[in-house]
Amino acid sequence: MSRQNPVRSTRGNSLRAREAQQAQDAPLFQESSSNVFVVEKVLNKRLTRGGSEYYIKWQGFPESECSWEPIENLQCDRMIQEYEKEAAKRTTRKRRYSPQPSTSSSAELQPSTSDEWAGKTLKTIIGITKAPGELHFLCKFSDDSVHLIPLREANVRFPSQVIKFYETRLVLQGVSPTIPGGMS
């Protein structure tokens, strides 16, 4: 079922009857040569190659008559500004996507005390972050628990895994690899 724009619609008498009724109710919004419709609400926005379009709910028309309109066809700057302000509020409230699974729904991961992970076997170092003033490794242990370990402690307790972590992420710029045997 396609939705048609009431501005461009030529469906028949029922739409024309509604237009005639609107002309009687609001003569200021009706011109003799062309129809001007009243915007009830701006519902959505999309970007197209031609520019911005807004999804409009027309006053006096059902939800099924909503349509996408280019900004050039609209004369409701205040409503568009209000919609943009509300849309900006909605986007700032959204949380950013993190590929790492969340370990706590309400609080960030806090640095662990050594008794929480003492005696556990380190499975992998996931990442590194600067938590309250110093660097911490985000470590996953064999029991699938995740803890923030201070850099100094990780260097002492898990030196080989720390080196392996750095080696997998180290990128040298401006250094050409040499091939053993004299060729470079």
From Swiss-Prot:
Cellular location of this protein? Nucleus
Provide the GO biological process annotations. germ cell development; gonad development; heterochromatin formation; negative regulation of gene expression; negative regulation of Ras protein signal transduction; negative regulation of vulval development; nematode larval development; positive regulation of growth rate
**Gene Ontology CC:** heterochromatin; nucleus; pericentric heterochromatin
Predominantly, its location class is nucleus
Compositionally biased tracts (Polar residues): 1-13, 99-115
InterPro entries registered for this protein in UniProt: Chromo-like_dom_sf, Chromo/chromo_shadow_dom, Chromo_dom_subgr, Chromo_domain, Chromo_shadow_dom, Chromodomain_CS, Heterochromatin_chromo-domain
Domain Chromo positions: 37-95
User: Which CDD domains does the UniProt entry name for this protein?
Assistant: CD_HP1_like (cd18960), CSD (cd00034)
Provide the residue span(s) of the region labelled Disordered. 1-27, 87-115
Judging by the UniProt lineage, the source's domain of life is Eukaryota
Q: What happens when the gene is disrupted?
A: RNAi-mediated knockdown in a hpl-2 mutant background causes larval arrest.
Which GO terms of the molecular function aspect are on file?
chromatin binding; enzyme binding; methylated histone binding
Subunit: Interacts with histone demethylase spr-5. Interacts with chromobox protein homolog hpl-2. Interacts with histone H3 tails methylated at 'Lys-9' (H3K9me3) and 'Lys-23'(H3K23me2). Interacts with histone H1 variant his-24 (when monomethylated at 'Lys-14'); the interaction is direct. May interact with the REST corepressor rcor-1, histone deacetylase hda-1, and the histone demethylase lsd-1.
The record describes the protein's role as: Seems to be involved in transcriptional silencing in heterochromatin-like complexes. Involved in epigenetic repression. Probably does not act as global transcriptional repressor. Plays a role in linking epigenetic regulation with the innate immune response. Acting in concert with chromobox protein homolog hpl-2 and histone H1 protein his-24, involved in reproduction, somatic gonad development, male tail development and vulval cell fate decisions; perhaps as a result of modulating expression of Hox genes mab-5 and egl-5.
Protein name, as recorded: Chromobox protein homolog hpl-1
Upper lineage is:
Eukaryota, Metazoa, Ecdysozoa, Nematoda, Chromadorea
